[in-house]
């Protein structure tokens, strides 16, 4: 179960919407990893591979996923909100709902982090904790499934359609800078 956070993305920062989509694939991957570890180990001792997979997934959600949320909430969504067109109002209401979902996900990730650290430190989880861990992972998978669908099928295409190329380029620079990188 070796997992690498740094797998080569399909997009570069010159395609910021593609970069956001790549992040969604990583979120799905690492939630699947947590679900797999939870199902295999059932709160018991973790094999070396399970431990490494758990640590990698937790690290991704602690660092990478928070940057992704900032990419959307600080880079993409404000640009969409700055466009004053009546035909975009319904979509912007969806953007508001997405931000609410991000807050819900943040709370879920915090609890998963706490339980995952506990599991790694103690070597096992009590029944109530392992049940809660599995529930949280399932809840986050459901939450992200809906969130990602709205973003990829509605919000991202709208962004490409309404944002000028210069704004998309600026987004790419901001996303790269958030990761301490020069834009490719």
Question: Across the structure, where does each feature detected by a protein language model lie?
Answer:
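Small-residue-biased structural context
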Residues: 1-184
